[in-house]
Amino acid sequence: VLSPADKSNVKAAWDKVGGSAGDYGAEALERMFLSFPTTKTYFPHFDLSHGSAQVKGHGKKVGDALGNAVAHLDDLPGALSALSDLHAHKLRVDPVNFKLLSHCLLVTVACHHPNDFTPAVHASLDKFLANVSTVLVSKYR
């Protein structure tokens, strides 16, 4: 459960991401594909090269979904229900991949905002992304 301080940290960090959420999402995806090559198996139809339109497009979806989650911190299950259904029933993404992408998102935010990425912000974003991952895998059972 996110504390009031966590919620404040997440909102403040996401405000810094601002209109670049799609770019951060794409960068995190690229980082994930390079660091964890097995994740590429879910995107056999994508051009996974640096800067590809398909990775940018999916990065925008990731960024938009996270922005929606930040806007609904008190109701993540409601905000992410359709996405949970999609990943569990249609895409059948292995749940471990959400943890890998979360790690890559943390690294991406830290790289772009090193002075703002304090231990407290890091912990809050990590909790938030863990909560998002938990919601996304909730329909797997």
From Swiss-Prot:
<dbReference type="GO" id="GO:0020037">
    <property type="term" value="F:heme binding"/>
</dbReference>
<feature type="modified residue" description="Phosphoserine">
    <location>
        <position position="35"/>
    </location>
</feature>
<feature type="modified residue" description="Phosphoserine">
    <location>
        <position position="3"/>
    </location>
</feature>
<dbReference type="GO" id="GO:0019825">
    <property type="term" value="F:oxygen binding"/>
</dbReference>
<feature type="modified residue" description="Phosphothreonine">
    <location>
        <position position="108"/>
    </location>
</feature>
<keyword id="KW-0597">Phosphoprotein</keyword>
<dbReference type="GO" id="GO:0005506">
    <property type="term" value="F:iron ion binding"/>
</dbReference>
<comment type="subunit">
    <text>Heterotetramer of two alpha chains and two beta chains.</text>
</comment>
<feature type="modified residue" description="Phosphotyrosine">
    <location>
        <position position="24"/>
    </location>
</feature>
<dbReference type="InterPro" id="IPR000971">
    <property type="entry name" value="Globin"/>
</dbReference>
<feature type="modified residue" description="N6-succinyllysine">
    <location>
        <position position="40"/>
    </location>
</feature>
<dbReference type="Pfam" id="PF00042">
    <property type="entry name" value="Globin"/>
</dbReference>
<dbReference type="GO" id="GO:0005344">
    <property type="term" value="F:oxygen carrier activity"/>
</dbReference>
<feature type="modified residue" description="Phosphoserine">
    <location>
        <position position="138"/>
    </location>
</feature>
<feature type="binding site" description="proximal binding residue">
    <location>
        <position position="87"/>
    </location>
    <ligand>
        <name>heme b</name>
    </ligand>
</feature>
<dbReference type="InterPro" id="IPR012292">
    <property type="entry name" value="Globin/Proto"/>
</dbReference>
<dbReference type="GO" id="GO:0043177">
    <property type="term" value="F:organic acid binding"/>
</dbReference>
<keyword id="KW-0007">Acetylation</keyword>
<dbReference type="InterPro" id="IPR002338">
    <property type="entry name" value="Hemoglobin_a-typ"/>
</dbReference>
<feature type="modified residue" description="N6-succinyllysine">
    <location>
        <position position="7"/>
    </location>
</feature>
<dbReference type="GO" id="GO:0072562">
    <property type="term" value="C:blood microparticle"/>
</dbReference>
<keyword id="KW-0408">Iron</keyword>
<dbReference type="GO" id="GO:0031720">
    <property type="term" value="F:haptoglobin binding"/>
</dbReference>
<dbReference type="GO" id="GO:0042744">
    <property type="term" value="P:hydrogen peroxide catabolic process"/>
</dbReference>
<dbReference type="InterPro" id="IPR002339">
    <property type="entry name" value="Hemoglobin_pi"/>
</dbReference>
<keyword id="KW-0813">Transport</keyword>
<feature type="binding site">
    <location>
        <position position="58"/>
    </location>
    <ligand>
        <name>O2</name>
    </ligand>
</feature>
<feature type="modified residue" description="N6-acetyllysine; alternate">
    <location>
        <position position="16"/>
    </location>
</feature>
<feature type="modified residue" description="Phosphoserine">
    <location>
        <position position="102"/>
    </location>
</feature>
<feature type="modified residue" description="Phosphoserine">
    <location>
        <position position="124"/>
    </location>
</feature>
<dbReference type="InterPro" id="IPR009050">
    <property type="entry name" value="Globin-like_sf"/>
</dbReference>
<dbReference type="GO" id="GO:0005833">
    <property type="term" value="C:hemoglobin complex"/>
</dbReference>
<dbReference type="GO" id="GO:0004601">
    <property type="term" value="F:peroxidase activity"/>
</dbReference>
<feature type="modified residue" description="Phosphothreonine">
    <location>
        <position position="134"/>
    </location>
</feature>
<comment type="similarity">
    <text>Belongs to the globin family.</text>
</comment>
<feature type="modified residue" description="Phosphoserine">
    <location>
        <position position="49"/>
    </location>
</feature>
<dbReference type="InterPro" id="IPR050056">
    <property type="entry name" value="Hemoglobin_oxygen_transport"/>
</dbReference>
<feature type="domain" description="Globin">
    <location>
        <begin position="1"/>
        <end position="141"/>
    </location>
</feature>
<keyword id="KW-0349">Heme</keyword>
<keyword id="KW-0479">Metal-binding</keyword>
<keyword id="KW-0561">Oxygen transport</keyword>
<comment type="function">
    <text>Involved in oxygen transport from the lung to the various peripheral tissues.</text>
</comment>
